[in-house]
Regions:
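Glycine-rich flexible loops
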Residues: 2-222
Length: 222
């Protein structure tokens, strides 16, 4: 699921972009959901170019192969590097930032509030609650992202590949403030929206799993 490759396949002409870029090094497989349909398309695509070093699975990612594990690994590095270089051909878009407070809250201040709001009562567990472990990220790229003026728009357009939704859900929670009240309200709204989303799209045999957010964006924090 290389991000650079998905940045190419997810464009309106993504298939052609990848075909032009890779030539006979990799063959492009049209999108299909994971399962039999995708497997059939993969088999057909490989038959059309048996000497290729990889398969571009549109909106999924890249599969590379070779006679040895080392050869397969080297093919992966080569093909992803080509995608990374191709992405740089485009124009760089600068995202305008919001005006941040002079003294924004720190992760150590926000973390306990998040853990408390995400805890769920469960009398079968020690302490009577099911709790979560948070992992914080706040490098320069992430801070530019979460501090963007249009964060509420571009953060909600969906994951770059359906496979990510297994771990992250389809969209993150964007906090409108880092007070206890704002965090509690934000999580409650997320759960409500996710539950409604599940009810709209579920099949009769589906059971909803944990409706809590898996990724939380806090402007000024991370």
């Amino acid at each position: 699921h290389a991000s650079a490759l998905l940045a190419l396949t997810n464009q309106p002409a993504g298939g052609q972009i990848c075909a032009d870029l890779y030539g006979d090094k990799a063959v492009v497989v049209p999108y299909a959901m994971s399962g039999l349909a995708l497997a059939q398309r993969v088999a057909k695509a490989h038959e059309s170019l048996p000497g290729c070093r990889g398969l571009i699975l549109s909106n999924h990612g890249l599969v590379s192969f070779g006679e040895t594990a080392q050869a397969s690994y080297e093919a992966m590095i080569e093909l992803v590097t080509m995608a990374e270089e191709r992405v740089l051909w485009g124009w760089t878009k600068v995202f305008a930032s919001i005006d941040l407070p002079v003294d924004p809250p720190t992760p150590s201040q926000v973390g306990p509030l998040l853990r408390g709001a995400l805890a769920r009562a469960d009398n079968d567990l020690p302490g009577g609650h099911e709790r979560v472990v948070l992992a914080y990220r706040g490098d320069n790229e992430i801070m530019h992202y979460v501090n963007g003026r249009d964060l509420a728009r571009y953060s909600q357009v969906g994951v770059v590949t359906p496979d990510h939704a297994i771990r992250t859900k389809g969209w993150p929670l964007v906090l409108d403030g880092c007070t206890k009240e704002a965090i509690t309200a934000g999580i409650a709204t997320f759960v409500e929206n996710y539950t409604a989303y599940f009810e709209r799209h579920k099949r009769p045999d589906m059971v909803m799993l944990d409706p809590l957010p898996k990724v939380i964006l806090a402007p000024g924090v991370g």
